[in-house]
A protein has these predicted regions:
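Membrane-embedded alpha-helical hairpins and interfacial helices in multi-pass inner-membrane proteins
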Residues: 47, 124-197
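Interfacial aromatic-anchored transmembrane helix boundaries in multi-pass membrane proteins
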Residues: 39-47, 82-109
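Membrane-water interface at transmembrane helix exits
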Residues: 33-38, 66, 70, 86, ...
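Membrane-helix interface segments
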Residues: 72-76, 93, 118-121
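Short helix-perturbing small/polar motifs within transmembrane alpha-helices
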Residues: 32, 99-138, 189
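Aromatic-anchored segments of alpha-helical transmembrane domains
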Residues: 27-35, 81-89, 129-137
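Membrane topogenic helices and adjacent juxtamembrane segments
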Residues: 2-38, 152-153, 161, 166-172, ...
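Hydrophobic transmembrane alpha-helices
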Residues: 10-76, 80
Length: 206
């Protein structure tokens, strides 16, 4: 039988209405900044490194959400909201869905393992894992290649763009793609820490 202290602790870990509103607001900001990262995709090499570019831009909303809602399920809900927004706007593919789900689960699991501690390194690693969710977008060019290139040309991309993109497909670029969430996510986390140093210090994040 649980004592009063355990019941109180379990109660504080539950998501409340205010938490859900906070998650919703930062999820919307994350989505908008992620779209901004996708716009940079008009430069072929930046599109192939999209997870890293997105990591640089989206560190602020994710890290702030982590600092404000240190409870189980927060990251999964953020991922779900983002996925729904992508689906509604027609940006979601099966491959992106797979990588996004896996990344959300890993990020949430890491936060659970570290007991949702207010520790910058733990929060940054969780964010980096979350950044791997966007891997599925550029990864499609390696998985589907010819059919993917044909599709984007039919969707209005110029022949020059498609040719430039095709010329970048290589094993070294694939390795760079897989590393990009680590680099971009780390930069994004450091930017958020620099901009909101006072908030992080007040929340006990070191």
């Amino acid at each position: 039988m649980q004592n009063k202290g355990e019941l109180t602790m379990n109660e504080t870990k539950k998501l409340k209405g205010r938490d859900l509103i906070t998650i919703g607001i930062f999820s919307a900001l994350y989505f908008i900044l992620n779209l901004a990262a996708m716009i940079t995709g008009f430069v072929p090499v930046l599109w192939l490194l999209l997870p890293g570019v997105a990591g640089v831009l989206t560190g602020i909303p994710f890290m702030l959400m982590e600092s404000k809602v240190q409870k189980p399920g927060a990251i999964l809900i953020m991922g779900l909201i983002t996925a729904v927004l992508y689906f509604v706007t027609g940006q979601f593919t099966v491959l992106l869905l797979i990588t996004f789900v896996v990344a959300c689960i890993l990020s949430e699991a890491y936060r659970a393992i570290t007991k949702y501690e207010n520790h910058f390194i733990h929060m940054a690693i969780s964010f980096i894992l979350f950044c791997y969710g966007m891997l599925g977008s550029p990864l499609a060019i390696w998985v589907y290649k010819d059919s993917f290139l044909t599709q984007i040309q039919q969707n209005g991309m110029s022949a020059e763009y498609v040719e430039s993109l095709s010329g970048l497909i290589s094993v070294p670029m694939l390795i760079a793609l897989c590393i990009s969430p680590i680099v971009g996510g780390a930069i994004g986390a450091l930017i958020s820490k620099g901009l909101f140093r006072k908030h992080f210090r007040k929340a006990g994040i070191v």
